[in-house]
Amino acid sequence: MRIGEIETNSPVILAPMAGVTNMPFRVLCREIEQELTGTASGLYVCEMITARAMVERNEKTMHMTTFADVERPRSMQLYTVDPKYTYEAVRMIVDEDIADHIDMNFGCPVPKVTRRGGGSAIPYKRRLYGNIVRAAVAATEGTDIPVTVKFRIGIDDDHHTHLDAGRIAAEEGAAAVALHARTAAQRYSGSARWDEIARLVEHMDGTDVPVIGNGDIFAAEDAARMMAQTGCHGVEVGRGCLGRPWLFAQLGAQLRGEDVPPEPTLGQVARIIYRHAELLAQHDGEDHACRDIRKHTGWYLRGFPVGGEFRKQLAQVTSLTQLQALLDTIADSTELADNADDARGRQGSPSKVALPEGWLDDPEDETVPEGAEIENNGG
């Protein structure tokens, strides 16, 4: 897949997920893909970075922009609502050589974001959305750094925006667009509507801007099926990789026509869990690593017959030594997980999208929403 001047051996992208796709997880995914297939071939995108917090050099935000030496190309996603901060943040990325690819987030459906006019609420305001994309592209002028854009089908079924969002992004110079095939109202519930990806692909015909599909990819076969059904040029995977960092090796192999690596045994997963914790400790210290790995162990052990007491003990680890001792008890297990490629992560149910008062009155309004920048929490 080609995005601007970036060419990858696999059309697979790791979707940014807060609290998950930090440097340790990205490095782990790359290591496993390299080990199983001989290449680290896709794009691994960092956690969403708030443009304003970056411009203000918030300490936590700047730490989140850290990339490992092995990460090439370095891929960063920005959350922004204001063309001014967008331009300044992207210029900062360019001038300080922070990343090689910039993705713009217009897909977040979280109520605390949309009720202020951010995230998946933005594409409804066509001019504002276009101004933001234009600012990002302008800030990369004279470089090889491509700007890509991610959005949803729309706010709800009465307010679809993805076709306009794709065309506007192309007109403003975006190098690719990605569609999460759900509305903001759906959040993560129900099934992704791949037919809308196909509609966007058709709508973008003639622009030379590739379309990346996102939604309900939990197994290697899913990615191949999405690309065949929709004609999309690449796939983006989020929740499917929770506790399954080897999924990228499987996806890449499937799409290249190679033998797909099998699901790992419980013993192999134990070694992956420890490596993940080790990378977390190197990045953020052992105390933080032992707290952070707890949520991951629930995902890693899904479908394995390990029992509630073992899971409870893992959730209480306070040192890498303690974690290693627990994992040693399952290190020789050849058990395989049941239903390993079932849906995982957030699902919930659809709900009305929280929006600022009068937000839907004028889709051409380009006023920057007040207070829509997420607080400086690194989000």
Which positions does each model-derived feature cover?
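Active-site beta-loop-alpha junctions enriched in small/polar residues
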Residues: M17-G19, I49-A51, Y79-V81, G107-P109, ...
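Short, solvent-exposed helix-helix connector turns and helix-capping sites enriched
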Residues: R57-T61, K125, L179, R244, ...
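Glycine-rich, positively charged N-terminal anion/phosphate-binding segment
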Residues: R2, M17-E96
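Alpha/beta enzyme core
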Residues: E35-T39, Y87-G118, I122, R126-P210
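Active-site mouth loops of central-metabolism enzymes
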Residues: P11-T21, P73-T86, I122-P123, V149-H162
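Hydrophobic faces of well-ordered beta-strands that scaffold small-molecule active sites
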Residues: V12-A15, Y44-C46, R74-L78, D100-I102, ...
